[in-house]
Amino acid sequence: MTNIRKTHPLAKIVNNSFIDLPAPSNISAWWNFGSLLGVCLILQILTGLFLAMHYTSDTATAFSSVTHICRDVNYGWIIRYMHANGASMFFICLFLHVGRGLYYGSYVFMETWNIGIVLLFATMATAFMGYVLPWGQMSFWGATVITNLLSAIPYIGTDLVEWIWGGFSVDKATLTRFFAFHFILPFIIAALAMVHLLFLHETGSNNPSGITSDSDKIPFHPYYTIKDILGALLLLLILMSLVLFSPDLLGDPDNYTPANPLNTPPHIKPEWYFLFAYAILRSIPNKLGGVLALVFSILILAFIPLLHTSKQRSMMFRPLSQCLFWLLVADLLTLTWIGGQPVEHPFIIIGQVASILYFTILLILMPTVSVIENNLLKW
């Protein structure tokens, strides 16, 4: 008799995705982040569900309801901090996952890569709306500043902003709809993640060498299941260390002050994972230009496969491209630092240089250096 996992319509899908899936024998720990993102998403949906049971999306009671969760609900404090810091872990895994894709040329799988970009945008939108929900000072002013950017769109901008707000300012209607969207989006992300996997399994995984691994495959289970479980345990160890020892390390103290439309905080800034994009936005003196740069700072990823001029897929054997890649990482860290600094000398000029360098590396230097490497190898 054939095993049920190979015949049952549902079990068969699970079997072909997580058990009998042929996987390259040499994929490193950098390939763990996909499963870690899945763990993060499940964790966020579960903690978010329990938070939603006690949260009220009304301007008069939102802040108090979060306080109530932390003080009065059984283990509410740990659920709240796991959700808040879980978002940080989510973005750390996201950035490392995208970085891995850039380094090893995973973007050659166009469909998988493009769905990944959509996933990145959806996750950023979800995180932004979630940050508004506690209705602290930074929640309110962050929502005001970021939604206001849409007013830079010619002709329809102002109407669009007021339509999103549900009025003439960020208010009760805005908070209610943000809660609704924040609740539904993670399920859309989960569906997109399945499509992401579907496209990946059409081609099979890439590997560090960038060379086809069809001649050397191993079953996903037990080799990569145990590896993924180890990764998940390490992720939980880091997350719980953060939650239990310094839960407010990555948060903004301003968000412990209830939202006040009459009092603007001295430095409005988003959560740390958006600071690099925020720095690029602020580097351009023109509003529309800044918004376009902000969008393209992420959308530029869609152009990476088109700019791949190297005859090798991975950067594993391309030392010049490796240097540029790590320069890009350093540049993004610089932008993250600048995004959290006030708009004054010398931070303005550092931000502008770092922003120009970011686009220059991706659009000009990397394709050029790839051609040079091809010629050095007499290809």
Curated annotation (Swiss-Prot):
Enumerate the subcellular locations listed in this protein's record, separating them with semicolons. Mitochondrion inner membrane
- Where does this protein hold a ubiquinone? 201
GO MF term set? metal ion binding; ubiquinol-cytochrome-c reductase activity
What SUPFAM superfamilies does its record include? Answer: a domain/subunit of cytochrome bc1 complex (Ubiquinol-cytochrome c reductase), Transmembrane di-heme cytochromes
Q: Which GO terms describe its biological process?
A: mitochondrial electron transport, ubiquinol to cytochrome c
Q: How is the cofactor bound?
A: Binds 2 heme b groups non-covalently.
**Which Pfam families did the record assign?**
Cytochrom_B_C, Cytochrome_B
Residue stretches spanning the membrane: 33-53, 77-98, 113-133, 178-198, 226-246, 288-308, 320-340, 347-367
Query: How does the entry describe its membrane topology?
Result: Multi-pass membrane protein
Keywords from the UniProt entry = Electron transport, Heme, Iron, Membrane, Metal-binding, Mitochondrion, Mitochondrion inner membrane, Respiratory chain, Transmembrane, Transmembrane helix, Transport, Ubiquinone
Could you confirm whether the keyword Transmembrane appears in this record? yes
Report the superkingdom from the record.
Eukaryota
Q: Which GO terms describe its cellular component?
A: mitochondrial inner membrane; respiratory chain complex III
Q: Which cofactor does it need?
A: heme b
Q: Which family, according to the similarity comment?
A: Belongs to the cytochrome b family.
An additional note in the Swiss-Prot or TrEMBL entry is:
Heme 1 (or BL or b562) is low-potential and absorbs at about 562 nm, and heme 2 (or BH or b566) is high-potential and absorbs at about 566 nm.
PANTHER family reported in the protein's UniProt record: CYTOCHROME B
Q: What's the protein name?
A: Cytochrome b
